Amino acid sequence: VTENANPVIRSEPESDAAAESLERLDRVLDAAGELLVRWGYRRVTIEDVADRAGIGKGTVYLHFPTKEALFLTVLLRGYRSVVGGIVERMRADPLEVLPGRMTRSLFVALLADPVARPIYFGDTELLGRLAKEATNTLGPLRERGQELNRSHFQLLRDAGLLRTDRTLAEQHYLLQAVGAGFWFLEGFELPSAPADPAARAELQEYALVAALEPADRPEPTVELAEVVARLYESLIDVIDEEWRRRVR
């Protein structure tokens, strides 16, 4: 999610004008991400982003009608990188298909990213505004993500990697509730919280393992990890489609 980690999605061939427009979009999104880290969502204006990107304010508005739309696109570009990281980790280590390990690794990766950290953990105003914007514009992407998570959990249940004393829906809700709680608490300096982010991530995994995994869980196979990785890889196509739909 860091600067230039997610260049604007391109299709070949491109005209010179189209290539120039996409390069300009890259600069705008990089600038918005940098300013978000430095100043926070409330202080950043479209004019600030334009100045940082070296273009006119009107040019930014050609691509993004509102500040919320701009930062939602920053989030969307970052989300593509997040999903890509999940896929890579699953292919490198089959244990990453387990909800606790997957969430632990994601937590550590996002905390280490200077742009993702304020979006996911710190800037409540930004999250609130983007949630409202996303409700109106990212419905299909959200629905696909939920469908994918359910398929992921069903594969794990079929392989004996998740307990079956709770319904799949209950387990999915539990994952979301535990994850949201840990992420929300990152905005507070609780005296009981471990100082090391890795230790906080380990506690998140501990909670999910205790709640979701059977005591006699087998080891996830490479074959299963590839099937689950392909599920998440398919989400990247949906992200790309949403990108092309919303970016002018």
Model-identified regions with their sequence ranges:
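Amphipathic alpha-helical segments that line or abut small-molecule/effector binding pockets
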Residues: D30, E96-P114, Y173, A198-V209
